[in-house]
Amino acid sequence: VRSRRQRQMCIRDRRIARWAHQVGAVVVVDASQAVPQMPVNVTELGADLLAFTGHKMLGPTGIGILWGRYDLLDDLPPFLGGGEMIEVVHMTGSTYAKPPHRFEAGTPPITQLAALGVAADYLDGVGMAAIAQREHQLAALMLEGLGSVPGVHILGPTDATARTGTVSFTVDGVHPHDAMSIMDGRGVAVRGGHHCARPLHERLGIQSSLRASSYLYTTEAEIDRLVESVDHARNFFVGGTRS
């Protein structure tokens, strides 16, 4: 499963990993969008390596997690040098520690580790299935509300159960950066740009898009305010409001 950054659709097809393994490929999963929002089972996915970041799951910035098959990690060389990643050092050579220490050189980010652990415990207490259900509820509200604004085009599935609580969209006649500025003035934070997915935007025939992200703490009233601010931005630049 992977929740794509831009179109926010959930890809759960186990065949992808099987096809990759049939030709000897290593399956690397970027799960930064998925892990905070739904149950993820690395074994069921068929992943060889899976990575995600801390700041998308209520944790701090500057820290992430890499899970990997031990046999694969054991074959990989270190990418940084420093304390803890060395086993034995001689003038003529050295050997490296076993994973995970081989990949954790130097002083670890102690405060970030502690904070990420607390965040993970909190999410585990809430329950990932419950979070996924809440994400679907919020997505449904956003899709319905944004769909009522003239000129708004949703990117990705319009079925809330097929996506997360993040919705990307465009507004006819309004550049995302302009809409973002107007909405910011009304206390609504969205992202405008290509969201690290420029090739996808080119594929869709658009230069950039807006992205509204919700999470378990988002309220229905905040979704209503988002929709109202999008409608206001469109009216500001091209005129016309929702009926």
Where are these regions (language model features)?
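Single conserved hydrophobic/aromatic residue that forms the stacking wall/gate
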Residues: 1-11
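Catalytic PLP-binding core of fold-type I/II PLP enzymes
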Residues: 12-48
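Alpha-helical scaffolding segments of alpha/beta enzyme cores, especially the outer helices
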Residues: 15-18, 22, 118, 137, ...
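Hydrophobic beta-strand scaffold residues
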Residues: 27-28, 154, 190
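Active-site C-terminal subdomain of aminotransferase-like
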Residues: 58-62, 67-134, 140
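Conserved small-domain helix->loop->beta segment predominantly found in fold-type I
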Residues: 104, 123-175
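PLP-dependent enzyme catalytic core of the Aspartate aminotransferase-like
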Residues: 112, 117, 180, 185, ...
